[in-house]
């Protein structure tokens, strides 16, 4: 069994996870030894984050208040979705089970042939980082990803900068 706290407890980025092996461990002895060797050579434990595991697993387990209307994550998602759908040249689907949104750009309107260049142009001009779709194995240069965990004011500011940027953007 594999599990983690990143999504269930809204601490994305901390990469706190675990693996539980049950049953006849003798059959998995080589696998277990390989995991032990790999973890002792290549992995560095996130000691500060490990301190929250016991509290997280032993405490209140619901995120319902965050994802219902009025909740922080709900309001952040609504903010980013509504702001993006109102920008000419962007189409977007509202996410239902993620902390990010994956908008589509009208590549003809903006003359986009390289989504990485688009992200770099936006970063250089407006100092806001977007992740190009190719970073998630998206084949066409027409998507980018935005995590909507920052507070609503930060999201509004960033999307305002994107709207201003796209008003005059044509990729060279």
Language-model features, listed with the residues they occupy:
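Conserved core segment of the aminotransferase class I/II
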Residues: 1-71, 81-82, 166
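Conserved glycine-rich beta-strand-loop-beta hairpin in the small C-terminal domain of fold type I
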Residues: 54, 70-84, 92-106, 140
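PLP-dependent enzyme catalytic core of the Aspartate aminotransferase-like
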Residues: 111-113, 121-130, 136-172
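Short active-site alpha-helical segment characteristic of glycosyltransferases
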Residues: 118
């Amino acid at each position: 069994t594999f599990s983690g706290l990143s999504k269930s407890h809204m601490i994305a980025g901390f990469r706190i996870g675990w693996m539980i092996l049950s049953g006849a461990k003798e059959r998995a002895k080589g696998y277990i030894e390989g995991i032990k060797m790999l973890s002792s050579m290549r992995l560095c434990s996130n000691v500060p984050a490990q301190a929250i595991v016991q509290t997280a697993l032993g405490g209140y387990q619901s995120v319902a208040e965050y994802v219902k209307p009025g909740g922080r994550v709900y309001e952040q998602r609504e903010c980013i979705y509504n702001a993006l759908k109102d920008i000419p040249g962007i189409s977007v689907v509202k996410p239902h089970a993620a902390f990010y949104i994956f908008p589509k750009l009208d590549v003809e309107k903006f003359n986009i042939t390289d989504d990485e260049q688009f992200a770099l142009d936006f970063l250089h001009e407006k100092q806001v980082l977007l992740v190009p779709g190719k970073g998630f194995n998206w084949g066409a240069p027409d998507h980018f990803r935005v995590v909507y965990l920052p507070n609503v004011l930060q999201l509004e500011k960033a999307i305002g900068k994107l709207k201003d940027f796209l008003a005059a953007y044509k990729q060279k």
